[in-house]
Swiss-Prot record:
EC class of the enzyme, as a word: transferase
Annotated family: Belongs to the pyridoxine kinase family. PdxK subfamily.
Binding-site residues for substrate, renumbered to this chain: S23, H59, D234
The protein's Enzyme Commission number: 2.7.1.35
InterPro entries: PdxK (IPR023479), PM/HMP-P_kinase-1 (IPR013749), PyrdxlKinase (IPR004625), Ribokinase-like (IPR029056)
Binding annotation for ATP: D125, T157, E162, T195, H222, P223, R224, I225, T232
Pathway listed: Cofactor metabolism; pyridoxal 5'-phosphate salvage; pyridoxal 5'-phosphate from pyridoxal: step 1/1; Cofactor metabolism; pyridoxal 5'-phosphate salvage; pyridoxine 5'-phosphate from pyridoxine: step 1/1; Cofactor metabolism; pyridoxal 5'-phosphate salvage; pyridoxamine 5'-phosphate from pyridoxamine: step 1/1
Role according to the record: B6-vitamer kinase involved in the salvage pathway of pyridoxal 5'-phosphate (PLP). Catalyzes the phosphorylation of pyridoxine (PN), pyridoxal (PL), and pyridoxamine (PM), forming their respective 5'-phosphorylated esters, i.e. PNP, PLP and PMP.
A GO term, aspect molecular function: ATP binding
Residues reported in the UniProt entry to bind Mg(2+): Y136, E162
Domain of life: Bacteria
Name the record gives this protein: Pyridoxine/pyridoxal/pyridoxamine kinase
């Protein structure tokens, strides 16, 4: 009715700016449910590749779903390449992964993409756990992420707990966080933004994040909002990625992402919601 059908071989594909590889839920705001609207609000074409599919996050009384079958997961990635959708790719954003097998498949695919498109930025949020929950990923994930995924990243956005486990070092003070972060930097891994950093140094109403490169370290403080929805790290890494792709310097991008998360947390508190409330205009929160 609206056009001729066919294989589309002669037509141009949708060129993706970002491939976001994360969790997906039917109900709630975590993983790609957060990353997709945040990145798209900045005018980016995004391919959302699910790693797990859950009804909701595990802190509810009921939970259904699980990790995607490995042949499905690998197929999603390889078919993006097969469709020609990656010719203008700018970034790969990685979040929650379902098991070590997914880490291995994803790492091989990223290597293939980088061989063809070496300028693509790889930003990894190495989701492992947090101080209040402990490790909440599958057995073997810490080792798989450390050995296979981290070496491919240009930048990392761990929380304080994850930094400690990945580096094998204490990360209680600012100095310890900087040392632990730099132990993971390489010629390829250029920077790290550590969220919920150095908790032993927080005031009653503030928290810290640290921006660490080989030659510099900056501390940013932000308000401590008395709510704890899931998905704040996913929101932070998506906003950070969007700002970096706009050409914003790392420290400014991290500040903008931090402000954005604080805005979301304030909205969540006002709504008295268990779920993270996304800002109504995801592009406006930027520290002047």
């Amino acid at each position: 009715m609206f056009g001729e059908t066919g294989t589309g071989d002669a037509l141009r594909p949708i060129f993706m700016d970002v491939v976001s590889v994360q969790s997906q839920v039917v109900y709630g705001h975590v993983g790609n449910n957060v990353a997709l609207p945040t990145l798209r609000a900045h005018g980016l074409n995004v391919a959302a590749v699910p790693t797990v599919m859950f009804s909701n996050t595990p802190h509810y009384p009921t939970l259904h779903g699980g990790a995607l079958p490995i042949d499905w997961f690998g197929g999603y990635l390889s078919d993006l390449s097969a469709r020609g959708a990656l010719q203008r790719l700018k970034a790969i954003l990685v979040g929650y992964l379902g098991n070590p097998e997914q880490v291995a498949v994803l790492s091989r695919w990223i290597n293939q993409v980088l061989a063809e498109h070496p300028d693509v930025q790889v930003i990894v949020d190495p989701v492992i756990g947090d101080h209040d929950t402990g490790i909440y990923v599958a057995d073997g994930m810490v080792e798989a992420v450390r050995e296979l995924l981290l070496p491919l990243a240009h930048g990392l956005t761990p929380n304080d707990f994850e930094l400690g486990h990945l580096s094998g070092r204490s990360a209680d003070s600012v100095e310890q966080v900087v040392a632990a972060a730099r132990s993971l930097l390489t010629d390829r891994v250029q920077w790290m933004v550590v969220t919920s950093a150095a908790p032993g140094t927080w005031g009653h109403d503030d928290m810290k994040l640290l921006i660490v490169t080989r030659d510099d370290a900056q501390v940013l403080s932000h308000p401590r909002i008395p709510v704890s929805p899931k998905g704040t790290g996913d929101l932070f890494s998506a906003k950070l990625t969007a700002r970096l792709l706009e050409g914003m310097p790392l420290a400014e991008a991290a500040a903008s992402a931090s402000d954005h998360v604080v805005t979301a947390l304030e909205a969540t508190r006002r709504a008295q919601s268990l779920e993270l409330q996304l800002p109504s205009n995801p592009c406006i929160t930027h520290r002047e």
